[in-house]
């Protein structure tokens, strides 16, 4: 047996059906779409249409709503600020603002900023912070360290 004598088993490789290639092909003229009507035209996909039965979107109940006045917060942890201080990206003499946090890469957009104190039980640096919101524990830790919230 040689490489040029190899061939596929019968039925292993099936040619795809070529539609709209003449009447003799069996799928010519109307190309299997029937005669006239909406589904015989091009661009037929009707989103959500289930052939007359009530669509899924109407069978399921409405749930909840999106409040348009919800405030979106960037969450930042005291631990991250402490790490930025030890790395030298922030200094204790300056007021820490949202713009400064964007500049050093701790947050990446202009949404409101909320300071949390997850997994932080002590904070030693006296900082001046001007952010949009603070958790009660974060407030307590900063004021205990001699910092101030503007």
Swiss-Prot record:
Signal peptide: none annotated. The keyword Ribosomal protein applies. NCBIfam families: rplO_bact. Binds to the 23S rRNA. GO terms for biological process: translation. Part of the 50S ribosomal subunit. This is Large ribosomal subunit protein uL15. It comes from Rickettsia typhi (strain ATCC VR-144 / Wilmington). Keywords: Ribonucleoprotein, Ribosomal protein, RNA-binding, rRNA-binding. SUPFAM superfamilies: Ribosomal proteins L15p and L18e. One of its GO terms (cellular component) is large ribosomal subunit.
């Amino acid at each position: 047996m040689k490489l040029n004598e190899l061939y596929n088993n019968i039925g292993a490789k099936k040619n795809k059906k070529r539609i709209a290639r003449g009447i003799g092909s069996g799928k010519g003229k109307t190309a299997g779409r029937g005669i006239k009507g909406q589904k015989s035209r091009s661009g037929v996909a009707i989103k959500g249409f289930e052939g007359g039965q009530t669509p899924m979107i109407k069978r399921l109940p409405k749930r909840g709503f999106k409040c348009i006045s919800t405030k979106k917060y960037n969450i930042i942890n005291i631990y991250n600020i402490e790490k930025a201080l030890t790395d030298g990206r922030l200094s204790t003499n300056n007021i820490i603002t949202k713009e400064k946090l964007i500049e050093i890469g701790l947050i990446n957009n202009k949404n409101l900023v909320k300071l949390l104190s997850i997994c932080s039980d002590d904070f030693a640096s006296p900082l001046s912070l001007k952010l949009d919101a603070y958790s009660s524990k974060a407030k307590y830790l900063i004021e205990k360290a001699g910092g101030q919230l503007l």
